[in-house]
Amino acid sequence: MEYSFPHYLLSKQSVDDRALNKDVLAALMANLPNQSPRIIEVGAGIGTMLRRLVRWDVIHHAEYVIVDEMAENIEYASEWIPQWATGAGLSVERIGASQLWLFDKTYNIHVHLEKADVFDFIQRENKPADLLIAHAFLDLLPMPESLSGLFSLTRKFAWLTLNFDGVTTFEPTLDTALDKQIERLYHHTMDMRATGGDSRSGRHLFGHLKSMDAEILAAGASDWVVHAVGRKYPEEEAYFLYFILHFFEESLQKHPELNTLAFAGWLQARRKQIEHGDLVYIAHQMDFLVKRNGEKSV
């Protein structure tokens, strides 16, 4: 199987749609300014969150800045955003090499595509947003030290979604001891990333945000739950599951504590479960809507 990261981001749209905490989303909709908010999304990938916010009628008139360090993602977004926008009945105009204008009688959205490391972007950005979005991203960063820079990007609100919180479950069980070992070692690789990361970032954000004098307006679980219906996974969720196993393989295939043959057999068995529509995958995550208060947040 060919593994493409943009394809993975496409495949998890329906998974994320279900997972996003709807109470936190309702709080966002109640607080987001109605008149042309400026939104910055860091680690934005190919722009799936922008599409979601349009589909869900969360934004109509907005300036939306997509920031991602992977050139592959930004290039894909540049082609894909006009495709789905046109399919949704919107007109699309390109403005230079890195801007898109999506519009009709209801929508007027200016999109800026920024290929940049998030910390480089923080250093040069001097126009704070009304809303900062970090979707499935904070658990990849050093915490809590990254938060002050991130919060400098918003004058008021931050929507921090799908923050992993230490629970990964594959069902049915293959080998209880091996399943637990693989989960433990995989979580440990998150904690040991050279670039930072935290396998329990969800629960830890409560304390981190409090220490910054940021007000948590809403918080709740946003678990990924993927299972087949009638032996078939919805949308492209089978590809999503294969990619999750690919993450495990890439992270653990040379781990000194893990028996190589046992792990290879485990991966093969889990892939067979996907083929037969038997695999259930659950990952526990947390969403937050946060209000920045005063200068302590910067």
Q: Where are each of the predicted segments found?
A:
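C-terminal helical/coil "lid" or tail adjacent to the Rossmann-like core of SAM-dependent
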Residues: G220-I274
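Glycine-rich SAM-binding Motif I of class I
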Residues: G47-R51
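Class I SAM-dependent methyltransferase SAM/SAH-binding core
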Residues: L53-D120
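A short, conserved alpha-helix within the catalytic core of class I
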Residues: L140-L153, L162
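A conserved beta-strand element that flanks and buttresses the S-adenosyl-L-methionine
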Residues: I133
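Conserved S-adenosyl-L-methionine
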Residues: G43
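Conserved catalytic/acceptor-binding region of the Class I
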Residues: K156-V229
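Class I SAM-dependent methyltransferase Rossmann-like catalytic core
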Residues: M1-N34, I46
